[in-house]
């Protein structure tokens, strides 16, 4: 596997025959995404295998809404700009773009949600980039949380690396908190 940035891809005059997987649309601006979509079309027009069309792939908020609507996700999400405050709690605020993780602790009331949203906007985060996410996770045992990840590549689901943490927000994990049995359980 070779990694190539969009900056590198869009500067190439020719590309080797390969399978190209377009990802991380929440990390690029609109114009780069549009150019990536044109590159995708050039690749497929020349019989190269390309996955995840930048022109039609959903970004975080629309994808989460779709998965929830299809019953695949049990939690809801709300666009802070368009949907207003959540109607279920607890929630947390995060950005739609980038991989910054949560921007707040768990918010349990509309008042806490409004106050946190106002504070993030005052700090310089754009309202149009903020979303509320309903928190539904439960610890796998007392004081231990696990985050799992999976990716679809074509028709194949590939599991990503899991992390374990003592905090509800298990983004990076904490070394030594999970046992070998926890990791073996994931392989079932």
Regions picked out by a protein language model, each given a short descriptive name:
Residues 85-103, 125-142:
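ATP-grasp fold ATP-binding core
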Residues 53-54, 101-107:
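Flexible, glycine/proline-enriched loop segments at strand-loop-helix junctions
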Residues 111-188:
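Phosphate-binding site of ATP-dependent enzymes
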Residues 19-20, 96, 180-181:
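Short, basic/glycine-rich phosphate-binding loops at helix/coil junctions
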Residues 29-30, 59-61, 99-103, 141-142, ...:
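Short catalytic/ligand-binding loop motif for oxyanion handling, primarily in non-cytosolic enzymes
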């Amino acid at each position: 596997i070779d990694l190539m940035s969009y900056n590198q891809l869009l500067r190439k005059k020719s590309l080797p025959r390969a399978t190209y997987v377009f990802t991380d649309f929440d990390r690029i601006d609109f114009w780069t995404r549009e150019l990536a979509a044109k590159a995708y079309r050039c690749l497929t027009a020349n019989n190269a295998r390309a996955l995840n069309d930048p022109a039609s792939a959903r970004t975080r908020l629309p994808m989460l809404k779709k998965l929830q609507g299809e019953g695949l996700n049990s939690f809801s999400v709300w666009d802070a700009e368009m949907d207003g405050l959540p109607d279920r709690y607890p929630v947390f605020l995060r950005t739609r773009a980038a991989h910054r993780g949560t921007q707040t602790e768990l918010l349990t009331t509309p008042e806490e949600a409004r106050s946190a949203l106002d504070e993030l906007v005052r700090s310089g985060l754009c309202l149009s980039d903020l979303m509320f996410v309903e928190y539904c996770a439960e610890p796998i045992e007392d004081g231990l949380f696990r985050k799992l990840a999976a990716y679809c590549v074509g028709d194949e689901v590939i599991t990503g690396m899991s992390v374990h943490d003592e905090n509800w927000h298990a983004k990076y994990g904490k070394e030594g908190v999970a046992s070998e049995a926890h990791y073996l359980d994931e392989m079932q």
